[in-house]
A protein has these predicted regions:
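Short aromatic-hydrophobic micro-motifs that form the base-stacking/packing surface
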Residues: 110-112
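N-terminal nucleotide-binding beta1-loop-alpha1 segment
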Residues: 1-14
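Short beta-strand/loop segment that forms part of the nucleotide-sugar
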Residues: 48-57
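Conserved alpha/beta core of the MobA/IspD/sugar-nucleotide pyrophosphorylase nucleotidyltransferase superfamily
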Residues: 175-237
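Short phosphate-binding loop-to-helix
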Residues: 63-108
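Conserved donor-nucleotide/metal-binding helix-loop-beta segment in metal-dependent transferases, i.e.
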Residues: 119-146
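Short, glycine-/small-residue-rich phosphate/pyrophosphate-handling segment
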Residues: 158-179
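A short, N-terminal amphipathic alpha-helix
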Residues: 27-47
Length: 237
């Protein structure tokens, strides 16, 4: 298991809607990462998985490590390795990480968004179980309600799953489903979830973590930032 390429704040949109200062967005990003890697660690108590945090650029390991759950390994995913035609941008980072995991001898690999701090451990356990009990044609996707995906797992490093994808748009999950169908994969869907990349999703996060035990590191960061903050009611999902 791995988080997606780390090193930037969750989304450029968080600087604008609502307006966050760079240090606020960075603090949230670090808290998200800790909560997600803690979720991976909790899931590992039920299924035989290993947690990784993918990062870029090289040389940032020391800055990243304090924000990871104990036992989380690092894996470089800067997209610098050769990739087939059509695999560009963020897709190169994802493919780089997936290939590296298989090169380490794992029988399955996945990419997991670090912008999903409230993702239930049970969902990750289900995803790993589906992957580990499926055939070599098995793939698993967890779509976000904004059209992206928070999870993509596979039994082989299928570069085609990352080819010709319009990254950072609301068609990413749909295009990935199309690529899986073209490759003849057995694609299984996880429950719909959400990631934090705009005012509406941040407002949802603040409300969801208020008075709950979910995402403790994120909850602490929200409290330290003096939130809940007023969000724009017009930014409904």
């Amino acid at each position: 298991m791995r988080n997606r390429c780390h090193g930037k704040v969750p989304s450029r949109r968080l600087f604008q809607d609502p307006p966050l200062r760079p240090e606020q967005a960075a603090r949230l990003s670090a808290a998200f990462l800790r909560d997600v890697t803690e979720t991976m660690r909790a899931a590992a108590a039920s299924v035989p998985i290993a947690g990784y945090a993918a990062y870029a650029p090289a040389g940032t390991e020391e800055a990243l490590t304090p924000h990871l759950a104990p036992g989380t390994s690092l894996i470089l995913a800067d997209g610098s390795v050769p990739a087939p035609a059509g695999v560009e941008g963020f897709g190169r980072c994802l493919l780089h990480a997936v290939r590296a995991l298989f090169d380490r001898g794992h029988t399955a690999a996945c990419v997991l968004s670090s912008d999903t701090p409230t993702l239930p451990t049970a969902t990750l356990v289900t995803a790993a179980t589906l992957l580990l009990t499926g055939s070599e044609r098995r793939a698993v996707i967890g779509a976000c309600d904004d059209g992206g995906y928070y999870f993509l797992g596979m039994r082989r490093p299928h570069a085609g799953l990352f080819a010709d994808i319009a990254w950072s748009t609301d068609t990413v999950a749909a295009q990935t489903r199309d690529r899986a169908a073209a490759l003849g994969l057995d694609l299984v869907e996880l429950p719909l979830w959400y990631d934090i990349d705009d005012a509406a999703s941040l407002d949802r996060l603040v409300q969801e973590t208020s008075g709950s035990n979910a995402a403790p590191w994120t909850r602490h960061a929200i409290g330290a930032l003096g939130w809940p903050v007023p969000m724009r009611s017009s930014c409904a999902a």
